[in-house]
Regions:
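The feature preferentially marks the first beta-strand/turn patch immediately downstream
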Residues: 1-296
Length: 296
């Protein structure tokens, strides 16, 4: 791993005891020791585990929790993805949430030079509801592994609303000045970790991204459904379309069941050729998923 832009600039050599075995895709791959280490090195999560203690620190998002002792009303123009399709539907009037967070999301450029946009940071919500559950109008695509990994988001997310996009300047003195576009997003949750109902649960499902959460720490709840994506929405859509068309499957189990390759975006040359053809086809038709129409 090359460490650049740090005061200890140099090379860090990492090793593991076993050979890489899992496919390289961030949805249902990177599931072995090498893959997890690789994704930790190149991924850029919304929040990072604090090096001391069991809570979280900001990375791509900062969070301003709205302290409420009782339930909070969700604005009627907030949206929530429709189960099975991912289409963004207005929550409507009279809906209640147990918790509200206001996220400021620091955008920057992806590695190919295109800047992150609002569509990128909300697309994981759409994906979780589109691929994690069957519903009216669904494409019939369901991967049990994806359903399990996105269950917490579907259970907790009551709605979200993009409030505005701000310009943020980080001034480090001299000529070190960085400017960022910063969407402000309100996210509403169905539960709170301090609920007696949550404390009494026996299903052993992880309550947040932290395996040992502190129920009184607002950052735990903030880690459940932050508006952020490490990938451009176009890459996620390319993977979705590849899976939907039978080119590959997100997870190893589903690949075995369907008799198709486990989706590997980097090392599988044959799948790479088919993905390139598919990407060009989607580009020529200016394809956009229905859930993003109006945003891109």
């Amino acid at each position: 791993v090359k460490l650049k832009d740090f005061m200890w600039n140099g090379w860090l050599r990492l090793g593991i005891a076993t050979k890489p075995a899992a496919a390289w895709n961030p949805v249902g791959g990177f599931s072995d020791a090498f893959g997890r280490m690789l994704w930790l090195a190149v991924g850029d999560p919304a929040l990072l585990p604090a090096p001391h203690g069991g809570n979280w620190i900001p990375n791509r998002v900062s969070v301003n929790p709205k302290p409420v002792a009782v339930a909070v009303a969700i604005p009627k123009d907030a949206v929530r993805p429709e189960p099975g399709t991912g289409l963004l539907r207005p929550v409507g009037g009279g809906r209640i949430a147990q918790q509200q967070f206001r996220y400021s999301v620091r955008l920057s450029a992806f590695h190919h030079g295109i800047h992150t946009g609002v569509a990128d940071i909300i697309y994981p919500y759409i994906f979780a509801f589109r691929w994690g559950i069957q519903g009216p109008g669904a494409s019939g695509a369901l991967d049990p592994s994806v359903a399990r990994s996105t269950a917490l988001v579907r259970e907790w997310l009551a709605g979200f609303k993009v409030i505005r996009v701000e310009e943020q300047v980080m001034n480090y003195g001299a000529d070190l000045k960085f400017s960022y576009r910063t969407p402000v997003v309100d996210v509403y949750l169905n539960h709170r970790l301090s609920d007696p109902w949550e404390r009494s649960r026996t299903d052993q499902r992880p309550r947040s991204l932290n395996p040992n959460p502190r129920s009184n720490d607002p950052w735990e709840e903030a880690s459940i459904a932050p508006p952020w994506s490490t990938l451009p929405w176009e890459v996620i859509v390319l993977m979705e379309e590849a899976v939907r068309r039978g080119i590959a499957a997100f997870s190893d189990g589903e690949a075995r069941r369907r008799g198709v390759p486990w989706l590997d975006l980097v090392r599988d040359k044959e799948t790479g050729k088919r993905l390139a053809v598919l990407a060009e086809s989607l580009r020529l038709e200016a394809y956009r998923p229905d859930a993003l129409k109006g945003l891109v």
